[in-house]
Curated annotation (Swiss-Prot):
This is Catechol 1,2-dioxygenase. GO terms for biological process: beta-ketoadipate pathway. It comes from the Bacteria. Binds 1 Fe(3+) ion per subunit. Induction: By phenol. Belongs to the intradiol ring-cleavage dioxygenase family. Pathway: Aromatic compound metabolism; beta-ketoadipate pathway; 5-oxo-4,5-dihydro-2-furylacetate from catechol: step 1/3. Its cofactor is Fe(3+). Keywords: Aromatic hydrocarbons catabolism, Dioxygenase, Iron, Oxidoreductase. GO terms for molecular function: catechol 1,2-dioxygenase activity.
Amino acid sequence: MNXQQIDMLVKQLN
């Protein structure tokens, strides 16, 4: 996972 993927997941979870 890269930073962009993590950022997208965090946005979906919040």
